[in-house]
Amino acid sequence: MIVLTIEEILKEVLNEIKPSKEDMEKLQLKANEIIDKIWEIVRENSYPILEVLLVGSSARNTNLKDDYDIDIFVLFDKSVSEDELEEIGLKIGTEAIKRLNGSYNINYASHPYVNGEVDGYEVDIVPCYKIDFGEKIISAVDRTPLHHKFLISRLNERLCDEVRLLKAFLKSLGLYGSDVKTKGFSGYLCELLILHYGSFINLLKEAQNWRIGKKIILKDIFEIYKDVDINKLKKFDEPFIVYDPVDLNRNVASPLSKDNFCRFIFYSRQFLKNPSIEFFKDYAKKLEEILENREHGYRLILKIPRENVVDDIIYPQMEKLQKSINKVIVKNEFVILNSKCFADDNYCYLYWEFLVYELPKIALREGPPVFEKERAERFLKKYGKVFIRDCKLFAYTEREYSHIIDLFKDIVNGNLQNISIPKYVNPRNGKIIELNSHGEHKQFNKECQ
């Protein structure tokens, strides 16, 4: 068996994940064609546009193979009202795509923008205000052109390839993406980390010294903001803090969960210890399959019809409901082995695995030593019939719930008042599904991916 060095592994990975020069040239030509069409529309209507800018990983040459999205930002003067920006922005975006015989729809971020397809390329045309470094943003997307301008002048070809390696590593681990479902690393965060540490391997090595609350302030910040005082920077109560060079009041790493922060540290260590190309090939998915191929406890799903709201709203509400239910489950002494939530277009799924589904109807309650008069009297008053063992008071009580299904039936029927019910994920609309076999569980997971 041939053992590859880290350098050989990374070279092989890069050959697999880096887009070809020909593909990048085709993308640039198509992006230029769309930008030319936008300027054509702007001139025809005398719209107050200051700049049209190609942004994102494709524009900065940090994209992975088969990731050829075209993100175009249309920059307005700050004197334009937000209503006018939205109206003109949508007119420009829809008309440009129509003239190129593409298809489109309207999506929403901090304000509406046009998402479409032109000759096989996914295209976003986003209106925003043109601002300078240090200026107050008007909408969240105003930062994006500055992100691009900050990075494009600092990322050379070598660093771009290092970013690609990091993205591929994170993608394989299931840690790439800052959406509410993934809670991982954004592409912009990847670029900043490589800029800060200089290479993929240096980043992995330095990550071994990270702890919760790790803070990164890029040296470039001091070049942009001459009078910045690090002691007066905004404080963040988050596991990983990377100050945005474009907006020092923003933590670029805020979407990253504590567990995913720790996963990155752990798997970075494993890769450095035992380098393998497998870390770049759906590693998390394979690991999950291994973990699933085991004996299981009792599993059930609470299946709730999904309201017509975006993931950014539905996932936090599912998590809030599951945490609230978990408190009730633990209070009733059932042991949770695993719990998670996910959603498709039609339903929200809250999943649990329990050590056992049924407990004895009788529970033993341990009280204080008999010598502690006041506590002993309170225990006696609460339980009535008590007995003494090893100088302590004990009592037998009847459990309110001896079967987990009975507890969930009361949740679905609305009989428990101490469940915090979010606006868009109501357990009273739910259906309890028991997963009795391993095959049934695997099929369910497949359907819900």
UniProtKB/Swiss-Prot annotation:
Enzyme Commission code? 2.7.7.72
| InterPro entries reported in the protein's UniProt record | CAA_C, CCA-adding_arc, CCA_tRNA_nucleotrans_2, NT_2-5OAS_ClassI-CCAase, NT_sf, NuclTrfase_I-like_C, Polymerase_NTP_transf_dom, tRNA_NucTransf2
- Cofactor needs: Mg(2+)
Residues in the signal sequence: none
Q: Which reaction does it catalyse?
A: a tRNA precursor + 2 CTP + ATP = a tRNA with a 3' CCA end + 3 diphosphate; a tRNA with a 3' CCA end + 2 CTP + ATP = a tRNA with a 3' CCACCA end + 3 diphosphate
Q: Name one Pfam family in it.
A: CAA_C
Top EC category: transferase
* Ligand binding (CTP): 57, 60, 147, 167, 176
Q: Any one Gene Ontology biological process term?
A: RNA repair
| Keywords recorded for this protein, A-Z | ATP-binding, Magnesium, Metal-binding, Nucleotide-binding, Nucleotidyltransferase, RNA repair, RNA-binding, Transferase, tRNA processing
Query: This protein's superkingdom?
Result: Archaea
* The keyword Magnesium belongs to this UniProt entry's keyword annotation: yes
Q: Which residues bind ATP?
A: 57, 60, 147, 167, 176
Where does this protein hold Mg(2+)? 69, 71, 124
Asked if the Swiss-Prot or TrEMBL record annotates the protein with the keyword Nucleotidyltransferase, the reply is yes
What Gene Ontology molecular-function terms does this entry list?
ATP binding; CCA tRNA nucleotidyltransferase activity; magnesium ion binding; tRNA binding
What family name appears in the similarity comment? Belongs to the tRNA nucleotidyltransferase/poly(A) polymerase family. Archaeal CCA-adding enzyme subfamily.
Q: What is known about what this protein does? A: Catalyzes the addition and repair of the essential 3'-terminal CCA sequence in tRNAs without using a nucleic acid template. Adds these three nucleotides in the order of C, C, and A to the tRNA nucleotide-73, using CTP and ATP as substrates and producing inorganic pyrophosphate. tRNA 3'-terminal CCA addition is required both for tRNA processing and repair. Also involved in tRNA surveillance by mediating tandem CCA addition to generate a CCACCA at the 3' terminus of unstable tRNAs. While stable tRNAs receive only 3'-terminal CCA, unstable tRNAs are marked with CCACCA and rapidly degraded.
The record's note on quaternary structure and interaction partners says: Homodimer.
Instruction: Recite the other comments.
Output: A single active site specifically recognizes both ATP and CTP and is responsible for their addition.
Q: Which NCBIfam families match?
A: cca_archaeal
This chain belongs to the protein called CCA-adding enzyme
